[in-house]
Amino acid sequence: MFMSSSSSSHARRPQLSSFSYLHPPLPFPGLSFFNTRDKRVNFDSTRIICIAKSKPARTTPEYSDVLQTGLPLIVEDDIQEQEEPLEVSLENQIRQGVDIVKSMLGSMEDGETSISAYDTAWVALVENIHHPGSPQFPSSLQWIANNQLPDGSWGDPDVFLAHDRLINTLACVIALKKWNIHPHKCKRGLSFVKENISKLEKENEEHMLIGFEIAFPSLLEMAKKLGIEIPDDSPALQDIYTKRDLKLTRIPKDIMHNVPTTLLYSLEGLPSLDWEKLVKLQCTDGSFLFSPSSTAFALMHTKDGNCFSYINNLVHKFNGGVPTVYPVDLFEHIWCVDRLQRLGISRFFHPEIKECLGYVHRYWTKDGICWARNSRVQDIDDTAMGFRLLRLHGYEVSPDVFKQFRKGDEFVCFMGQSNQAITGIYNLYRASQMMFPEETILEEAKKFSVNFLREKRAASELLDKWIITKDLPGEVGFALDVPWYACLPRVETRLYIEQYGGQDDVWIGKTLYRMPYVNNNVYLELAKLDYNNCQSLHRIEWDNIQKWYEGYNLGGFGVNKRSLLRTYFLATSNIFEPERSVERLTWAKTVILVQAIASYFENSREERIEFANEFQKFLNTRGYINGRRLDVKQATKGLIEMVFATLNQFSLDALVVHGEDITHHLYQSWEKWVLTWQEGGDRREGEAELLVQTINLMAGHTHSQEEELYERLFKLTNTVCHQLGHYHHLNKDKQPQQVEDNGGYNNSNPESISKLQIESDMRELVQLVLNSSDGMDSNIKQTFLTVTKSFYYTAFTHPGTVNYHIAKVLFERVV
């Protein structure tokens, strides 16, 4: 359960609780809010107790390790020996975790972020406008004095990055020296700089801070003027000076003084600036591209009132310290939604997510967005993530926002960037998969991003310049290997829970910084708890569906347990929510019944026709003519009675849940499939339509099938799934075709031509499903896409990968 501890009287913002398991004990430290003053969320440390049955818990590596010809060994005894499901519901624990996250999402304003010692030092350097010789913001100096680390440095206390510690520490030493205070702290800080400056040589270049090659030499020059002696013969420093000189020669001074660019973010390191021109490029909040240090530098030179207001507001808001960038409202709103979705817990927060995306859409522009609202500079990372989420949620957004980022055959994050960001191109790739027909710019974006990411993966160069995260190679690898058309929600969640670093993930700006509403252990532990809770139910269902399988002797009709497991896995990976159990089981049983009928009669057209005729007779008479049972072959009779018994159970389940009798609709749907199948013996013809119709009926969704849009959705879904089914059948014994390195397919191969048609139809289907202006219930439309993606997954996912996903999703608990 969640248990509140006594409130802290500490002046800093209260910690937001994280979760911890007591069996076994794993400490999860609380989530700190880094000295912010306005306190909207007040939750103390909490923990969760998971109570399991007395039987010792076991993990289930055998499902991923014990393979026979690429398939898991399915043995009844193995299944029964697995860890038993939880004895008690964790509903209350989950509810309390959800309440915490709801409070977080409901308190969003300009973004929660950590304090930057470097930026705070620049603010502390500002001289009082009315009292020369004294600091304008003494509370910033006090923050510096209060936050020196035990080793004498300033910076992120939990991650040692030499670039971060050195630039933070040198800036703070300069600020203290400037005002001749705390000489002991200055001495300790200077000793740290001298002892650690050589470590710059050993760090990954990808993790060099933004603008470090400009800002750090500038600080060294300031230190020298203040009489602070720092050895400048280090090879690392010489390399930094070389990079600075090269970058300064590339800066288009005429452009930067007349057009907003990312250079506004790092003015404090640039010489010979024309402030009369630059002040015209201020953001509406008075900042220079939302950078406190850049704005403080401008304030020193201009005494501009808008600059002063921006800095003054931050100093008061954060109790003397300031972040490295602020606001970060769009960044926070977008990335929170992405994390919640990938962690599989977004269903708890529909109103909050709607509000988040509505906020983002209000500040969306024809050129995209950046991390903060009302910016005249945009970046591809925030634009791509925003585009993807807005389109997924039915907003009309044009892909033309990406045109400004296209430079020749490449796409860049910013104008004038020196190197690409892995995550920026990764998010561009994710956005490009939301493609509608005729969106050429997204085709080009997908082609470029696929090539770029594959090259980086092949070279083991998946380090990013914007974030240090737990498993970026895993995230990128999954996205490349399992494209969005084949991405099943529960598979993505199961893997992302392991990839998400929680509060250990740290972002790279001018300094390292934290985004506690984006990266925290609260989301992570709630996701783990919810996943295991759902999985426990799925394991119970798996046991029950095996009993249903055995009870009807479906093995005798050509359906083996491997097929049963895969079918249930597909249903569960798409419809995983506990409250949607009837839809999930209906999906699995419908597919198994279709397979049994098609498998048993696949070699005889006459028997198919006989089955179809008897099926219709049974349908019309409910099994009786003049009070006597139909006289048919035992197998046909058994299958027909099996189908109708199962359909009647479906109807009863729907009646109990939704209070609506769907028997007639179910019978009609099955009759349509049977008649279609008996003509050519192809079970795939119309199977998707049967599945979509059945799932929607079980979900309580009814809609007129006469409408043109409904008919178009069925036609597209049937066409694509039929092609995918055949593709899978033809290629099930060989490696599925992979996307070529150029993001397309080899058109000389007949199978590739069919694949291109599938891709074209998928784009149209995605457009129909995501279009919110047609008036159709989005839940109804989503079923069409969900079913189609399951067919896509089956067709293009290697059997070994499927086995791995089955083991992870159904049988391996999250720890």
Curated annotation (Swiss-Prot):
GO terms for biological process: gibberellin biosynthetic process. Substrate binds at K247, K465. Its cofactor is Mg(2+). Pfam families: Terpene_synth, Terpene_synth_C. GO terms for cellular component: chloroplast. It catalyses: (2E,6E,10E)-geranylgeranyl diphosphate = (-)-kolavenyl diphosphate. Disulfide bonds: none annotated. GO terms for molecular function: isomerase activity; magnesium ion binding; terpene synthase activity. Inhibited by high concentrations of magnesium. Residues 1-51 form a transit peptide. It is found in: Plastid, Chloroplast. Keywords: Chloroplast, Isomerase, Magnesium, Metal-binding, Plastid, Transit peptide. Diterpene synthase that catalyzes the formation of (-)-kolavenyl diphosphate from geranylgeranyl diphosphate (GGPP). Belongs to the terpene synthase family. Tpsc subfamily. This is (-)-kolavenyl diphosphate synthase TPS28, chloroplastic.
